[in-house]
Amino acid sequence: MAAKEVRFGDSARQAVISGVNVLADAVKVTLGPKGRNVVLERSYGAPTITKDGVSVAKEIELKDKFENMGAQMVKEVASKTSDTAGDGTTTATVLAQSIVKEGMRYVAAGMNPMDLKRGIEKAVTGAVEELKKLSKPCSTSKEIAQVGSISANSDTEIGRIIAEAMDKVGKEGVITVEDGSGLENELDVVEGMQFDRGYLSPYFVSSADKQIAALESPFVLLHDKKISNIRDLLPVLEQVAKAGKPLLIIAEDVDGEALATLVVNNIRGILKTCAVKAPGFGDRRKAMLEDIAILTGGTVIAEEVGLSLEKTRLEDLGQAKRIEVGKENTTIIDGAGDVKTIEARVAQIRKQIEEASSDYDREKLQERVAKLAGGVALIKVGAATEVEMKEKKARVEDALHATRAAVEEGIVPGGGVALLRTINAVSKIKGDNHDQDSGIKIVLRAMEEPLRQIVTNCGDEASVVVNKVKEGQGTFGYNAATGEYGDLVAMGVLDPTKVTRSALQNAASVAGLILTTDAMVAELPKEDSPGAGAGMGGMGGMGGMDM
């Protein structure tokens, strides 16, 4: 086991503060509309330019192991805030640095760190309650666009395109971000349910120019097994032919004479059909077939529920207004399923999302919700160079997270004002002793810090602005982008409540742990053995080896 170095008390705390300051100082230059960029070196390719706090934090690794521990603790604040709210990472870092800095002064003065921590926790609980009172629902498209713009560093174009995407696919819809091919941002929307399986034979194509099979008001047959024998299919094909409607078959696979017969019937115009493989694999395939059945008002023909292909009736088939089948995708538009049944299915999948343990499962379940509840929107980010593309894409993703958070928990005035407005309520909270009161004071001071940093990044005098904003009430604040004072909500400077709340809670949580640290243990750096660094000429460099 390698030898360890142990530091205690003030020596340990000083190292932690140094690490916290290095990371926080690098991150906080990005805060606000006039925040600066940070350039991150890459071992290959062009460097990355970013204004995203968590991206900067993740890059920082310090040589001194004790300082590095401090930096890693604050990195955790940024990462946790990014995971829960998707934005607010820089605010969280600024808050954590302030709480640690102020707190260490009180610890050095001889106060009890545990009581300071309890005071900090009381203040944060009070501030969160006050934030909830300040919060108002984010419902209009205009507000969604404003939240998106602020999160994307005052880029109104990004805010607009996100609001448009949410309008099209609903608040539950999936919005994905991809690299575009031009200079402009583009929005593609897929309405209805789309899954990544295309036609099994090009002979099903009905529109030669678009290369798709378009079925108007079709029946949908869902089967969880492979279909090879045409005899199994004949009864249902005859019923569909009598009804005079097209048929889409979704099964594990369709091949052999079954596929050949369907193709021949299609070419001759006897019965318009199309066959596709069921999406997904294993249990996920069963679940997705069930989703399609609920969406189209049909039933999955499966042996385990006592249904067979030969005995299938028209009532077992699903229906839709239109289905388009391409080479790689199938889109079901306006399925005939019962709205209440669809809502119940969505609620059931949401419950599974809450219980899902892996991010992959959660993502796949979220996609299923979107396909049932809304649709899928694709934002294609346009840029002139790859470096700009990466930076812009990261901002779009940030803005997307922020707008989702705003829809979830509402919005508060932005620009660091929401935290300032909680100061009155928090200052009335009393601790159990003098040290706890000091803990509350630490948070009161920290809650000014985001606004101070925004103003500092603009090149203005922070104390003057903070005092002027404190004199105002409600949504009155400082718009750093224009340098004006006024009603921030009217100006469109908004923050999601969830982002502000998460930033404060996560910052206080980690800062509290740092303040109550009294000993640190780290591995001693390995010393090079003598002679190991010498040249290899005549094997002289091997002097450190035992022969």
Swiss-Prot record:
Organism of this sequence: Nitrosomonas europaea (strain ATCC 19718 / CIP 103999 / KCTC 2705 / NBRC 14298)
Gene3D superfamilies assigned: GroEL (3.50.7.10), GroEL-like equatorial domain (1.10.560.10), TCP-1-like chaperonin intermediate domain (3.30.260.10)
Lineage: Bacteria, Pseudomonadati, Pseudomonadota, Betaproteobacteria, Nitrosomonadales
Protein name per the record: Chaperonin GroEL
UniProt-annotated binding residues for ATP: 30-33, 51, 87-91, 415, 479-481, 495
Pfam families (UniProt xref): Cpn60_TCP1 (PF00118)
KW Cell division (keyword) present: no
Molecular function terms, GO-annotated: ATP binding; ATP-dependent protein folding chaperone; isomerase activity; unfolded protein binding
Biased composition (Gly residues): 532-547
